[in-house]
């Protein structure tokens, strides 16, 4: 079994679509092995998204991710990383395929509802950024 990291972003929490996202996750065959609602500080968001530090959108991304609560998740299933990327859909909801979370619930490129690890290396950094081993069941 493979694990991946996911975030339900502040825009989705604000719009009260968390339950819809969780339902789509479970319908997609994922087991939720870790979940917590947190509010990131700007510093925590900067640490989490450090790989984008030199990108022009870094400041806006960190401000967005720290504007309100998020739901941090660890998901488990065979091929979890690729399957979660597929269920999320394209970054821009306008380009996402029908049946994906971003097509169904995303608003814009920034307010696109969810984040997910893009590789095993990313997941191995992102999961322990939010969860310790005792919190994963």
From Swiss-Prot:
Keyword tRNA-binding present in the record's keywords: the answer is: no
Residues reported in the UniProt entry to bind ATP: 9, 57, 85, 91, 102, 112
Q: What is its main location?
A: cytoplasm
SUPFAM superfamilies of this UniProt entry? Nucleoside diphosphate kinase, NDK (SSF54919)
Q: Which compartment or compartments is the protein found in?
A: Cytoplasm
Functional description taken from the UniProt entry: Major role in the synthesis of nucleoside triphosphates other than ATP. The ATP gamma phosphate is transferred to the NDP beta phosphate via a ping-pong mechanism, using a phosphorylated active-site intermediate.
How is the subunit organization of this protein annotated in UniProt? Homotetramer.
Q: Which named protein is this? A: Nucleoside diphosphate kinase
What is the source species?
Citrifermentans bemidjiense (strain ATCC BAA-1014 / DSM 16622 / JCM 12645 / Bem) (Geobacter bemidjiensis)
Lineage, opening ranks: Bacteria, Pseudomonadati, Thermodesulfobacteriota, Desulfuromonadia, Geobacterales
């Amino acid at each position: 079994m493979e694990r991946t990291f996911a975030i339900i972003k502040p825009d989705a929490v604000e719009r009260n679509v968390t339950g819809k996202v969780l339902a789509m996750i479970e319908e997609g065959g994922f087991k939720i092995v870790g979940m917590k609602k947190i509010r990131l500080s700007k510093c925590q968001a900067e640490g989490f998204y450090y790989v984008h530090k030199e990108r022009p959108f870094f400041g806006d991304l960190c401000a967005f991710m720290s504007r309100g609560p998020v739901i941090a998740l660890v998901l488990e299933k065979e091929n979890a990383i690729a399957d979660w990327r597929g269920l999320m859909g394209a970054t821009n909801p306008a380009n996402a395929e029908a049946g994906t979370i971003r097509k169904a619930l995303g608003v814009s490129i920034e307010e696109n509802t969810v984040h997910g690890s893009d590789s095993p290396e990313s997941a191995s950094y992102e999961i322990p950024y939010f969860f310790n081993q005792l919190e994963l069941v």
